[in-house]
């Protein structure tokens, strides 16, 4: 087994490249066939068969999260020149239902990895010795999956969404993690409040990155974007504020004060984005909030901006909804996101509220001259308790799905991803890991309940647990729905957006 180039990081850097070039390498890849009690573990490995004294030998080790001992599969010796990387797999059984498992690929061989060998999780992850566990706070040091439960299917971790600036030495922590493609090969990512070790101490609001995407994989080569209208600059070492800083907001206090006083700060937080049909421009939806230590975080304005990734410029901006008074915040029906362009000339946006539990949809003509005016919006509702129809009456909105508590909702258009059209991921509980998928061919439904799952994460730490559940149409495949969440415990509690997959 060969630890891929750069894997043997327990030795000096100069020696690493020489050893890796001379011999074996490998890393864990995504498990498959996850049931309540079994899974098949996968890895990529290579061997040069340089010596018979240290033949290429590999196995997997695995354990339920929180358990100190490890189990392992039977070692397999295959001392042949693989002429590059090949896949190896081994099944494991006897697993616990609805349990987070962590796994590593282990081995030794050739002249660069001596016995008893080394173990690695995800590609470029940290190393550990066989029989021992890596740092439990480094979620990329292992390949992670959660087994199916009585009412859930298995989920698997795909890794962190990374930019080239987001390194182990200069780690970036931020939430949100919304994305959409603006071309067949490139996508735009939007993140929330951002900090970086050895970089910006705190950037309020939104930062952004753009780069290539590959279906079924977490992006690892995104480029940080400068503050518009500065032109994109490859190789940036730090994130920068992206959406405009809100002006004129008020604190949610009685009496209110200017936002930025009384332990508060103004922030522009994204609620969704989508490619504008027939262009390589993006529509970005975001709220302007005054984030206060006390009194809540009411959204005081909702904005829609047209963005050109080629020039990193905002082309147009509309503000359809402004709270009155500002400090009271917008009503739930106007807290919209998840833009979806219909083939009927309308732009659809989605939202949710609790108590009563409602997932709502609004529409407006798909024209920048229209979507900036709140008078052009209509909601799917039942005015006068009559039949469902489009209405201007905010108090008449009706839910497009039932039987779920929508702690968060994200919708996107998956047309072209196999037979799928619209898909919605709903976070079904607070601070824990549960979610369910829903699919439809029309924004108003009917929406069909799909698989339920738990993100492959402990969801411990941070005060809010796991949150920011979003689907990614450009990363999903016909049989795997790719989603992301903010993992508060990753990187030793520093926190990071991670991606996962669930069969659909």
What are the residue ranges of the model-derived segments?
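Beta-propeller and closely related beta-sheet repeat lectin domains
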Residues: 175-178, 240, 247, 255-274, ...
